[in-house]
Amino acid sequence: MKVFAGNSNRLLAEAICNYLNLPLGKATVRRFADQEIFVEIGENVRGEDVFIVQSTSFPTNDHLMELLIMIDAVRRSSARRITAVLPYFGYARQDRKPGPRTPISAKLVANLITEAGADRVLTLDLHAGQIQGFFDIPTDNLYAIPILARDVKENYNLKNVMVVSPDVGGVVRARALAKRLDCLLAIVDKRRDRPGESEVMNVIGEVNGKDCLLIDDIVDSGGTLCNAAEALLKNGATSVTAYITHGVLSGGAVARVTSSMLKELVITDSIQPTTAVQSAHNIRVISTAALLGEAISRTSQEESVSSLFD
């Protein structure tokens, strides 16, 4: 077994290798003067079970091309099996046609990864579960809920916790955490007037005097979370913390979060944190290395990964 990584999330790749007690594979990813991407694998992979760790996060297209070219390089080097490990799967929000004459980009990206030569895909908290079906190769979609629940138990009195979904679409995910913590569930009902903006309307559930935990898969602009936090506090919540798997945090999101009423934003390292994220006083990053490392180990040894979903 060998593990390689592109440039998108080398810190996580190194942490995964530390968990597996393996060195990170030698690979060079560089650009020519015209910005074409060039990949060179620096060690023998013939007959090896190869795992390539690459989040297709910002800059999404560059990191996606790095992944595809790296898969091709490993395939042409006679690897026995190639697993694309995608802690964050970019384009996942384009999982359906929002109108006429529009693409389903998530399906296109799945096709590209398959055609490049990947034999398996391992990912984390896909934005929509049906994206698993976009791949024509075995795909394991791990859940971050166990990691988030463990952190909540270490930092909160569960008797005073209320799990909150920031919108109706995230109720299933929030319910899974609430069930694991044996806590009550509330929902923030919001209306989005235009793309990139969200207006909180009302809170469904009694949050007065509760430590509210907003749960979602992606935080992008941060507008939804900040508005939800304000609404919850107006309804009597003692504090509001957000637990989000993927910290996209584009544009002015970090500044928006740091100046908001959120007590804390807890994200995973599925996307490598920027300097701004690392220096923010109310943003904390927790590791997925053990979860992904264990899944990689079991996959390589042909063992079941189903217990990792519990």
Curated annotation (Swiss-Prot):
Identify the residues that bind ATP.
Answer: 34-36, 93-94
Paste the cofactor note. Binds 2 Mg(2+) ions per subunit.
Extract the PROSITE patterns matched here. PRPP_SYNTHASE (PS00114)
Which terms does the record give in the GO molecular function aspect?
A: ATP binding; kinase activity; magnesium ion binding; ribose phosphate diphosphokinase activity
For activity, the cofactor(s) needed are: Mg(2+)
GO cellular component, alphabetical, reads: cytoplasm; ribose phosphate diphosphokinase complex
Q: Where in the cell is it found?
A: Cytoplasm
Q: Which UniProt keywords apply?
A: ATP-binding, Cytoplasm, Kinase, Magnesium, Metal-binding, Nucleotide biosynthesis, Nucleotide-binding, Transferase
Which protein, by its recorded name, is this? Ribose-phosphate pyrophosphokinase
